[in-house]
Every structure is written in C-alpha cells, then in structure tokens.
Amino acid sequence: MVTGGASGIGAATCRTLAAAGAQVTIADIDEAGAEALSRELPGAAVLILDITDEAAVNAAFARIRALDILVNNAGIGLVGGVEQTELADFTRLFQVNVQGMFLVTRAAMPLLLPSHGSIVNIGSVAGLVGVKKRFAYCATKGAVIAMTRQLAVDYPAELRVNCICPGTVDTPFVDAYLEKYHRHEKEKVRAELNQRQPIGRLGRPEEIANLALYLCSAEAEFVTGSVITIDGGWTAG
C-alpha cells in the first residue's frame, strides 16, 4: 500500500512496485487520480482514504486480508516562518503529515507483523536541516524521522522500518508551490530550486521510488531504522 499514491512520488512508487511484481493498493483522497493510475497498473486496487480520519482508516484496514509493504507517502506542505504560521495551518500540517502516518501505521501493524513486513516513510531533508520559511513543514518531517527510528527499536525482529529523505523533487507538489507563491516568476524560482541541490537539478520521482523498492526488498534485510537522504548533495556540505 502506498498512501498519497495517486501522484508524484507516490504514483512513481506504485508504478515501480507494480513493475517488480507487487500487488499495489493506491491509497489517496484523490479518487480521480487514483482511478486513472489504477488503469495503468493491471491488478492494482484503489482505496479512497482520508488518512486523518481515524474511523475511516480503521475500517479500511479491517477489510484488508494481507499486507507486506506500507509506504507512508501522503503529505502536504506549508510556506512560512514561525511568525507567519497560523495555528490552524500548523495543526492541519501535523494532522496529515504526522497524525495521518500514525493512524495508518497503527492500523497496519496487525497485518505487517505476521508477514515480517516493511514500512518506508517518506520524510524530507527538511526534517534534517533547517529550510527557510518552512517552520511547520520542518517540524512535521522531523517527527516522521523520529517515529521511524522509534518503530525500528520497538520491532527489531518483526518489522523493518526506514525513512527516505528526498531533496526537492519534480512533482505536482512543486508545481502547486510555484503556482501559488511564484506565479509570475516560475522559471526563475525553478532555476533556483535546481541550483539549491549541488547536482544542479530537481530529483525525479522514479529515483525516490527505486530507493523505496530496494528498502522493501529482500536485498535490504539488514536495513532498518535508517534515514537515507536522496537529495542531489543538498545536505552534504
């Protein structure tokens, strides 16, 4: 199962896992996007799910018979420093990025533990370093990293739990940011985003998905509790 699976990194992960033979469940609140992707992936299931709704999450997982892999990818962003951040926006970010991951993970545990499954959480370099004007977002991604490590400590023999921390990746998430905050200078700001990463470009969703595939595979049996950056060198210096 991939949450936020209808677009961006989530969609790329669904495609990559399906190509490797996984029976994928695309979990997303975006019904049209999830259905469109499912038509590309024979055998893929669609789960329309608001991950912040505890009752809906519990009911959804009660209907699932087996689960080997959970990719917690769903998330939202917010631009603003501490002085520009409203409590309602701060709370909403934590509801989706942190509480949502908690609810899904908790509901999935009765399925993942018997299968000795794997959880991959999609964090961000924003959880590792300060990013200007991303106060709430940095806080939520720091929490994702902490939850990853804690789960790995609690379940060392039964479950593998890892976190991927991407830099800026070329997804609809970035497109929406440019449209909302830089409508009249998109290309200029996109160029700045490229240069923020020493490699000189944005990441590709498929690159994140390939790392997720590795972490879910038997080749990564010795990998748990790890926080892995894939950021074009952003955090190297």
Regions found by a protein language model. Name each.
Residues 71, 156-160, 223-225:
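Short, small/polar-rich loop/turn modules that mediate ligand/substrate recognition or access, typified
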Residues 105, 140, 148:
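Active-site helix of classical SDR
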Residues 124:
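Residue(s) in the substrate-gating loop at a strand-loop-helix junction
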Residues 85, 130-138, 150, 177:
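Active-site loop-to-helix junction immediately N-terminal to the catalytic Tyr of the SDR YXXXK motif
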